[in-house]
Amino acid sequence: MVREEVAGSTQTLQWKCVESRVDSKRLYYGRFILSPLRKGQADTVGIALRRALLGEIEGTCITRAKFGSVPHEYSTIAGIEESVQEILLNLKEIVLRSNLYGVRDASICVKGPRYITAQDIILPPSVEIVDTAQPIANLTEPIDFCIDLQIKRDRGYQTELRKNYQDGSYPIDAVXMPVRNVNYSIFSCGNGNEKHEILFLEIWTNGSLTPKEALYEASRNLIDLFLPFLHAEEEGTSFEENKNRFTPPLFTFQKRLTNLKKNKKGIPLNCIFIDQLELTSRTYNCLKRANIHTLLDLLSKTEEDLLRIDSFRMEDRKHIWDTLEKHLPIDLLKNKLSF
């Protein structure tokens, strides 16, 4: 059935989700197709997306735990069934969902006897537990048990050297990889000059985001990687004589805007990336951390939205306003700008 639907479309390149299911709170599955592709293109797209999905998607996890006066991670605590090492391994498996950046504090403070699960973690408002039933420890006696935790959003594997900290804190080898697995396959169809390829992409996630969200983020990361090449191609390239280094020209927002003004259809705000706004590194990094990638993303935010961004200051707001006021048409600012 899928083959018949795809084979009928031989002109426009299209993505389509053909299957989506939730196997458990910590296992989401999605199956997508992209077609029609010329011979060889499916492999190119499949390899790039698979690597981006597995290595470029950010996740939130617990990176450190502090127990108090515990001599080493192989110690046992009176009244607790698990050793410190087993508790650390259980904390490592906790799946969190958030859009935070930087390090945040969390804690567990309960009184036994009882089972401790992920539901007992006291989290910042911006962090959510995917599966509250995940086990942490079993208190077998009426004792007070408290753990201080650190939470961080990152990507890939984060390992730290094991040290005996005098304050009783221990690092956790965090795995900030929301995408569990990615498979892709290629199906060829058609005859002669009409032959083309269909890319099938399967994505499994840990529940902190859906396969569709993961695919969108991976695609956006790939686009950001290739933006410098697009700028160089549009503006031309320059080589300095008697030197072995290549210097791409600065692609400014004003030049881009001038070209867009010539377009009778108007200014496609979703095609102007914040990389082109001549912002300071600090302001640019704040916006990127908040998933603001294009001018359309920026203009859809209110002043309150921006000030809620981690490390965003009033000076950054003024810098953004001055930049937009300098380059954008006044009528566009009145219609679109909400801060």
UniProtKB/Swiss-Prot annotation:
GO terms for biological process: DNA-templated transcription. The keyword Nucleotidyltransferase applies. It is found in: Plastid, Chloroplast. It comes from the Eukaryota. Its main location: plastid. Its EC number is 2.7.7.6. Residues 1-233 are annotated as: Alpha N-terminal domain (alpha-NTD). GO terms for molecular function: DNA binding; DNA-directed RNA polymerase activity; protein dimerization activity. In plastids the minimal PEP RNA polymerase catalytic core is composed of four subunits: alpha, beta, beta', and beta''. When a (nuclear-encoded) sigma factor is associated with the core the holoenzyme is formed, which can initiate transcription. Belongs to the RNA polymerase alpha chain family. DNA-dependent RNA polymerase catalyzes the transcription of DNA into RNA using the four ribonucleoside triphosphates as substrates. The N-terminal domain is essential for RNAP assembly and basal transcription, whereas the C-terminal domain is involved in interaction with transcriptional regulators and with upstream promoter elements. This is DNA-directed RNA polymerase subunit alpha.
